[in-house]
Regions:
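NTP-dependent nucleotidyl-transfer catalytic core
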Residues: 1-130
Length: 130
């Protein structure tokens, strides 16, 4: 069974543009992938379990997973598929939450941990749009 077949058998593949091409890439060489984590709380929760286990599976299969903390996107807020926008969090709270989640992710995922606030905080709107 290939790595992708294992993921599919476990119900971890919902949609893919080209399963054949993805399978080929996964079997040919190591890939780098990321999974995002929202800093809406100071701790991970049960909803983060499957993404974290998936990162571990990719690591075990020889790939390079990255856990991405959404420090910048957490400051913006989003509708989260709801009828109303998520409550805007203060910058200090997002920073605290990001640190807490980052420490937990380091212990659990064996992945590189990055925070998108690192490369977006000083970026101008023009630079972002370009």
């Amino acid at each position: 069974m290939t790595f992708l077949e294992e993921l599919k058998a476990r119900g971890l593949v919902h949609q893919c543009s080209n399963l054949e091409e993805l399978s080929k890439k996964l079997n040919e060489k190591s890939i780098t992938l990321y999974c995002g984590f929202d800093p809406t709380s100071d701790s991970l929760h049960v909803g983060n379990l499957i993404p974290m286990v998936s990162l571990l599976r990719f690591k075990k299969a020889g790939h390079n997973p990255i856990a991405l903390i959404g420090g910048a996107t957490g400051l913006i807020g989003d509708p989260s598929g709801k009828n109303q926008e998520r409550e805007m969090l203060l910058e200090d709270l997002v920073l605290t939450n990001s640190k807490g989640i980052g420490q937990q992710l380091e212990q659990i995922t064996q992945s590189k941990i990055v925070n998108n606030i690192t490369w977006t905080k000083e970026m101008s709107v023009i630079d972002f749009m370009r």
